[in-house]
C-alpha cells in the first residue's frame, strides 16, 4: 500500500513539474518572439524559429498573420534600427564601390570564395560610379518588392508605384504584371545568374535585344550587380557591362562593396537572428533603413502555400521551384520572414502579404 502511495506521489509531482515547466517555456517564447532588448536589438525565440516548417503547415496557422489595417509607423524604433545598423555598415557608402576603389588590372578576392580571384577589367572600371549612387539621398516612403507569387492577384501595382523610391529584386519583369507589382523601378538588383536563366546566356541576338530592351526601361535607375560574390558569373557580368557600354544605356551601375554582405549578416547575427547568407530581400531592407523614413515590403512570402492552403509560386513570373526549408539552401527565408513580421507588428516596417486597398 505504501509502495502504491509513493508511486502516486511521484507521478503527481512529475506532472506538476512538467505543467509548470511548459508554462514557463511558453511565457518565455511569447516574450522573446516580439521582445526588443537593450537599445532596440531584436530577439527571437529560437525554438519557435526552428519549428517554423511544422508551424506553417498547420491549417489556419496564425503565427505569421498580421494586420495592415490600423498599422502605424513607430518612428522612434525606425531611428533606433537605423542607428544600430550604422554600427555595422553605412549603406550610403557600402551600396557600391567607386572608381577610386580600384584601377584596371587590380586583382581582388571573391567575397564568398577567398581562394578565387577576379581581375578588374577596363569595362567594369569604366562603369563604376564616381560617387555612391545613394549619396545624400533620402525618401519619405520606400517600397522593397520581393518576387514571391503572393503578389499575383494582389492589385498592389498602384500602391507600390505611389512610393517615393521603389527597390526591386533580380531584374524581375514588371510590364505584364503591372496591376499586381507596378512598374516604377528606382533601384533594381541583378544577380549574374539572371543572364543565363532569363536571357538565354545571350546565345543569340534575340536574347541580347531582349536584355537591352529591359534595361532601356530603367532610364536613370540604379542597376545593382553583385559582381564580386562568387566565381562563375564573371563572364556574365562582362557581357552585361559590354552591352551597357555598346548601347549607351542610361542605367547607373553599382557594384556592392566587398564588406557589405558580411556586415549585414553580422548585424542580424548580433541581434540573435541566425541567418546563413542574407537573401536579396533582407539585404535590400537593411540597406533601405539608411535612406528611407518608412519602408513597405511587398512580395515577401517564403512558403509554398498561403494561409488558406492555396499554392504560391516561388516567383510570380516563372515556374522555378525552391525548397524553403532545405538545409542546403544558402538562405533561411522563413526565419527572415518571421523576423520581418515581428518588425511589422512593432511598426518598424509595413509588410503586405495580401491584397492592396484600391486607391
Curated annotation (Swiss-Prot):
GO molecular function: alpha-N-acetylneuraminate alpha-2,8-sialyltransferase activity; sialyltransferase activity
Keyword vocabulary terms for this entry: Disulfide bond, Glycoprotein, Glycosyltransferase, Golgi apparatus, Membrane, Secreted, Signal-anchor, Transferase, Transmembrane, Transmembrane helix
CC per GO annotation: extracellular region; Golgi membrane
Protein's cellular compartments: Golgi apparatus membrane; Secreted
Species of provenance: Cricetulus griseus
Keyword Cytoplasm: no
Family per similarity comment: Belongs to the glycosyltransferase 29 family.
Superkingdom of the organism of origin: Eukaryota
Active-site residues from the entry: 331
Spans through the membrane: 8-20
EC class (word): transferase
Protein name stated in the entry: CMP-N-acetylneuraminate-poly-alpha-2,8-sialyltransferase
Binding site residues for CMP-N-acetyl-beta-neuraminate: 147, 170, 279-281, 301
Catalytic activity: [N-acetyl-alpha-D-neuraminosyl-(2->8)](n) + CMP-N-acetyl-beta-neuraminate = [N-acetyl-alpha-D-neuraminosyl-(2->8)](n+1) + CMP + H(+)
Lineage: Eukaryota, Metazoa, Chordata, Craniata, Vertebrata
Amino acid at each position: 500500500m505504501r509502495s502504491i502511495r509513493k508511486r502516486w506521489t511521484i507521478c503527481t509531482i512529475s506532472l506538476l513539474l512538467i505543467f509548470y515547466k511548459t508554462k514557463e517555456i511558453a511565457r518565455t517564447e511569447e516574450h522573446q518572439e516580439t521582445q526588443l532588448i537593450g537599445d532596440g536589438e531584436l530577439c527571437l525565440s529560437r525554438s519557435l524559429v526552428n519549428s517554423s516548417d511544422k508551424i506553417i503547415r498547420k491549417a489556419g496557422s496564425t503565427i505569421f498573420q498580421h494586420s495592415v489595417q490600423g498599422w502605424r509607423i513607430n518612428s522612434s524604433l525606425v531611428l533606433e534600427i537605423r542607428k544600430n545598423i550604422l554600427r555595422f555598415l553605412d549603406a550610403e557608402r557600402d551600396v557600391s564601390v567607386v572608381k577610386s576603389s580600384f584601377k584596371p588590372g587590380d586583382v581582388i578576392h571573391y567575397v564568398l570564395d577567398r581562394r578565387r580571384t577576379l581581375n578588374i577589367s577596363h569595362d567594369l572600371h569604366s562603369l563604376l560610379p564616381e560617387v555612391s549612387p545613394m549619396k545624400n539621398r533620402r525618401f519619405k516612403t520606400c517600397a522593397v518588392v520581393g518576387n514571391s507569387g503572393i503578389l499575383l492577384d494582389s492589385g498592389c501595382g498602384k500602391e507600390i508605384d505611389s512610393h517615393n523610391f521603389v527597390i526591386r529584386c533580380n531584374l524581375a519583369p514588371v510590364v505584364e504584371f503591372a496591376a499586381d507589382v507596378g512598374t516604377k523601378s528606382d533601384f533594381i538588383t541583378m544577380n549574374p545568374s539572371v543572364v543565363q536563366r532569363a536571357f538565354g546566356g545571350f546565345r543569340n541576338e534575340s536574347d541580347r535585344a531582349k536584355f537591352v530592351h529591359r534595361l532601356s526601361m530603367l532610364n536613370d535607375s540604379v542597376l545593382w550587380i553583385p559582381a564580386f560574390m562568387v566565381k562563375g558569373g564573371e563572364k556574365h557580368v562582362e557581357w552585361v557591362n559590354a552591352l551597357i557600354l555598346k548601347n549607351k544605356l542610361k542605367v547607373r551601375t553599382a557594384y556592392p562593396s566587398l564588406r557589405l554582405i558580411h556586415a549585414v549578416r553580422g548585424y542580424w547575427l548580433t541581434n540573435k537572428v541566425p541567418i546563413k547568407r542574407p537573401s536579396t530581400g533582407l539585404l535590400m531592407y537593411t540597406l533601405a533603413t539608411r535612406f528611407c523614413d518608412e519602408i513597405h515590403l511587398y512580395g515577401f512570402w517564403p512558403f509554398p502555400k498561403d494561409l488558406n492552403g492555396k499554392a504560391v509560386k516561388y516567383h510570380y513570373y516563372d515556374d522555378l521551384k525552391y525548397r524553403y526549408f532545405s538545409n542546403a539552401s544558402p538562405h533561411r527565408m522563413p526565419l527572415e520572414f518571421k523576423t520581418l513580421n515581428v518588425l511589422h507588428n512593432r511598426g518598424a516596417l509595413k509588410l503586405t502579404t495580401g491584397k492592396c486597398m484600391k486607391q
